[in-house]
Amino acid sequence: MEELQGYLEEYRSRQQQFLYPLLFQEYIYVFAYDHGLNSSIFYEPQNSLGYDNKFSSVLVKRLIIRMYQKNYLIYSVNDIYQNIFVGHNNYFYFHFFSQILSEGFAVIVEIPFSLQLISSLEEKEIPKSHNLQSSHSIFPFLEDKLLHLNYLSDILIPYPAHMEILVQMLQSWIQDALSLHLLQFLLHEYYNWNSLIIPNKSIYVFSKDNKRLFCFLYNLYIYEYEFLLVFPCKQSSFLRLISSGVLLERIHFYVKIEHLGVCRIFCQKTLWIFKDPFIHYIRYQGKSILGSRGTHFLMKKWKYHLVHFWQYYFHFWSQPYRIDTKKLSNYSFYFLGYFSSVQMNSSMVRNQMLENSFLMDTLTKKLDTRIPIIPLIRSLSKAQFCTVSGYPISKPIWTDLADCDIINRFGRICRKLSHYHSGSSKKQSLYRMKYILRLSCARTLARKHKSSARSFLQRLSSGLLEEFFTEEEQVISLIFPKRTSFYLYGSYRERIWYLDIIRINDLVNSLLVTT
């Protein structure tokens, strides 16, 4: 218990007490909408986060002037409630001001965490490039480690039961009471207007208007969750700082936990003390995986440990159904857009010893990764590229564009999805997806010119093929120019993992959420 409290005091020693006055500075809102801190390693471009990049210095100055008025926010909310059907102009100003205020608040509360991460990286002399890892880098790790494990726990991280829990977590880091009261006000009002939280969804489902604030709150929550999970392990302390300090929900990390012992938790309940030399932990968004080489009884103790942490630290009711433990040899788990499983491959080897020969059956383990075709088709259907059954259709909203723009858009989507799913063990699902997008492109062009899709396929066959040519096929065609046609007809089965994927395509991300 004393060791855990020491860790908490060490990491929370740099609390900020005077953040609220920064809300009255105009440059804070410039940072929020222009990402003036772009030179640091914490931020992605705005188009990656979904911002519409709308900013008005006049409205920001007007907001700052009005905030100097006593109880301005309370009067504004009451006025909106009284004139909800007639005060459209007042509602617009309140919604716009509250959105700007939430973005500025998110920038301010990120400052202590950003400074802490920079100092930790400088102390450890860690290059910044190591902080941004590709999501595909997880799969070679799985190929190397999962083959030697016995059990796997599929964990769905519960979202906070009440927003006040998030405020209490932030209070342990920031001692500025005014900022905390402002956060409570924003959460309360946005919750009433159903603009901050989407009902019946996990917390990582953000609204478009408050994505930055929700990113911060969600990562703060994950910060505490992962700290309670791996605090006795020295190897995890560096990864903990990275995963929470970056404050953007594209972060995922994996770590091997050696000899992890569970001591005493805040509820003063003593758990079993156990050690496991082979524990692996991986997380993306609200889903995490815990693998072990131990026994099923050991995994049950892990489940007991996590459920009680949730119950006593985050004030949840007992939720054991969120942890599903299976034997790895009989289990297929879904993670990062792939269905993965460990398959046993049998091969017969003939051995010759003097005049005697005999056959030996050799078993080898291999990680099999496949694309979930049904959820992927469902995702394409929601984007209006095909029907629910996978039948390609035209996209009427794009018929006003030029032909080259239509082809480029379809080709870009196809290349991005193929780029991400290039690690599939079997390519049939990938080829079916490319076929849907290619035929949908032809039908969109045919609808624009009031012609048939067949005529456009015949007229633009070479152009469409080149536009839908994936990157890995281009590389293969350069390395093996004489065997290109052999690979393009579906016989190429090698998996390719890319180390430059730091953001998942929107269609793929919707697939991860809906599955």
From Swiss-Prot:
GO biological process: mRNA processing; RNA splicing; tRNA processing
Molecular function per GO: RNA binding
Residues annotated as signal peptide: none
InterPro entries, A to Z: Domain_X (IPR024937), Maturase_MatK (IPR002866), Maturase_MatK_N (IPR024942)
Keywords linked to the UniProt accession: Chloroplast, mRNA processing, Plastid, RNA-binding, tRNA processing
Keyword tRNA processing in record: yes
GO CC aspect terms: chloroplast
Record localization: Plastid, Chloroplast
Pfam families (UniProt xref): Intron_maturas2 (PF01348), MatK_N (PF01824)
Purpose of the protein: Usually encoded in the trnK tRNA gene intron. Probably assists in splicing its own and other chloroplast group II introns.
Stated family: Belongs to the intron maturase 2 family. MatK subfamily.
Protein name: Maturase K
Encoding gene, per UniProt annotation: matK
